[in-house]
Amino acid sequence: MDDRHEGDHHDIEVEGGALHGFERKISGILDDGSVGFRQPLLARNRKNTTSQIAIVGANTCPIESLDYEIFENDFFKQDWRSRKKIEILQYTFLKWALAFLIGLATGLVGFLNNLGVENIAGFKLLLIGNLMLKEKYFQAFFAFAGCNLILATAAASLCAFIAPAAAGSGIPEVKAYLNGIDAYSILAPSTLFVKIFGSIFGVAAGFVVGKEGPMVHTGACIANLLGQGGSKKYRLTWKWLRFFKNDRDRRDLITCGAAAGVAAAFRAPVGGVLFALEEAASWWRNALLWRTFFTTAVVAVVLRSLIEFCRSGRCGLFGKGGLIMFDVNSGPVLYSTPDLLAIVFLGVIGGVLGSLYNYLVDKVLRTYSIINEKGPRFKIMLVMAVSILSSCCAFGLPWLSQCTPCPIGIEEGKCPSVGRSSIYKSFQCPPNHYNDLSSLLLNTNDDAIRNLFTSRSENEFHISTLAIFFVAVYCLGIITYGIAIPSGLFIPVILAGASYGRLVGRLLGPVSQLDVGLFSLLGAASFLGGTMRMTVSLCVILLELTNNLLMLPLVMLVLLISKTVADCFNRGVYDQIVTMKGLPYMEDHAEPYMRNLVAKDVVSGALISFSRVEKVGVIWQALKMTRHNGFPVIDEPPFTEASELCGIALRSHLLVLLQGKKFSKQRTTFGSQILRSCKARDFGKAGLGKGLKIEDLDLSEEEMEMYVDLHPITNTSPYTVLETLSLAKAAILFRQLGLRHLCVVPKTPGRPPIVGILTRHDFMPEHVLGLYPHIDPLK
């Protein structure tokens, strides 16, 4: 980890005469009274005690930081100078080729996901419908609950035993990754596998969840898999792929994958690009905009082609459903003053209900995390309990609704309908009657939204039905999110918002000129704005979903109002989840209290540094006894006249250098020999599988006493700030440049060349306010 604040490692004992040099150098760190540059520049109690673990999915695991900075050491410079024009062309071509493959793969996975959900859920609903027609109500309930329970258990088992990181929507984890946070299996192939099949089983099981969030995570996993740079273990290496053995290029690919996931889930290519820009990515530039747009365009073409292929009935029960496209185009959109007042009211209600939703989701997630920590069995039992409750609500609540006569003039056979999805479901009703609540609860979530968005259907749903459905979906959405299955928040939020939006439209009645289907859309927009706090991307996604550009001004208005109101209470749901999971996310702004501090005020822990030519045993022992990922390299006499900062060496590069055993018995510079014997690709980030560990090194006692020149692997141009720089400016600099390490140097000469190193953990509020509890967090 890049946390350099190992409180447990302050008392280091070194055994064996071979390592007496390290013991002598570390002794300066342990002696508060000494003045060497290897000592801590702060008192012992100035340690960073922020957590180095976080919740990823439904699992607690260690976290790392990513190296988004270009590491300009001698190997990088040599590789950059030696690149030919054809190699630069290959690199550019490969970026676009991988963007195409990400779009193609994500589109295929999105289609197969929907195909599976529609067929599994469709078979289940047809079975229930046939039993209800035969008035076998108990058998219908047990068949319904049993199918849901089996599917839910399958999804939970995959998450509990194969990839706990696949639980939840995955958007907070992807957002954290693009901010520079990595965790074990966050984008692993096993996570991708469970995300796909767990999402199919979970959505088909009738939970109030969506597949949109999991699709974002799925797209990111696909991008990560394609951008691994090959695998030596499975002999999947290719010379071109070496260009992507770094976090910076993988970050761009994963941004494309996240955008492709939204495009595949909503059939909203432009909305996918804007979602990645507004919510997911922490860094953006024009070149990335082009590639994400190209990726989502590929997704759109793939989905359109596959949907056309299925229109002739070649895909089983898959038809209009699944890849949701809600056509609420009802001609000219006319509205009066009462309509505008109602829209403002919808925005306010959406903001209040959305902030309350976020608050309750946070409380439920904290409770579920306690249960999930007890082991896989408890995760599965929790999923089963929520499944049974959801089945009881979906099957039991329609009995509270009254049977409604079919509308006059409707085509014969459409009311009540016999198919698996319709707005007119008979349930227990007599001939020529339908149960409106069953058409919302005993349906796939996509079809329920489609029914709520239906235009020119003012009286199809009773006011009491909409109220019952809203309360049920609101509560079930809260208690379902957080269980150990892949689950998204978009669909529950759209369902709840569309139901109360339609309810407001019904209450207005003849006073309003807007169709109730349009009120459903505006209600969904208000609730989305109140929970997720996005505006531009949500507006475009909703317009692409509904194919109704005439609603643009009203959707913009309701989103702005709901977001403004909700911001008065708390943060967006994904921001809250990131904080709750313990992910050290760097915001794009500095906190107000940071202006009262300077960089040196939060530098913590004992700083361990190396000489340019260092003894192998000293490096080995430092790597063994700490988890630091960055070590300052100091030029010392006789190589320079005075001690000066040479740069930073990464832990991964040190391990590769030690494994190569490019040592010397004399303490002399021999970096040119190392440059000739190694290549830049040898120091590239590991792809599939884990990189080198200190335990993998096999060094003899004789080798421990030898020396190694660290200059070839040292980033000689690290970002540095003066110790007197405002902490607020340091935080903004750290965030905007995507740094992992920020060196703090002294302002006055004659002191040690480096004061300390800042990492993202040093900017976390719990660390800063822990050091200075008297500071007002709001000032």
From Swiss-Prot:
Which tissues does it occur in?
A: Broadly expressed in the plant.
| Function, in words | Voltage-gated chloride channel.
Q: Where are the transmembrane segments?
A: 92-112, 142-162, 190-210, 215-235, 257-277, 287-307, 341-361, 380-400, 466-486, 488-508, 520-540, 541-561, 741-761
- Protein name (database record): Chloride channel protein CLC-c
Q: Does Cytoplasm count among this protein's keywords? A: no
Keyword vocabulary terms for this entry: CBS domain, Chloride, Chloride channel, Ion channel, Ion transport, Membrane, Phosphoprotein, Repeat, Transmembrane, Transmembrane helix, Transport, Voltage-gated channel
The record, for Gene3D superfamilies, names:
CBS-domain, Clc chloride channel
Assembly state and interactors?
Answer: Homodimer. Interacts with PP2A5.
Its main localization is: membrane
Topology relative to the lipid bilayer, per the entry, is: Multi-pass membrane protein
Q: Localized where?
A: Membrane
Give the family from UniProt.
Answer: Belongs to the chloride channel (TC 2.A.49) family.
Q: Which Pfam families did the record assign?
A: CBS, Voltage_CLC
Phosphoserine: residues carrying this PTM: 27, 672
One GO MF term: voltage-gated chloride channel activity
Q: Which organism is it from?
A: Arabidopsis thaliana
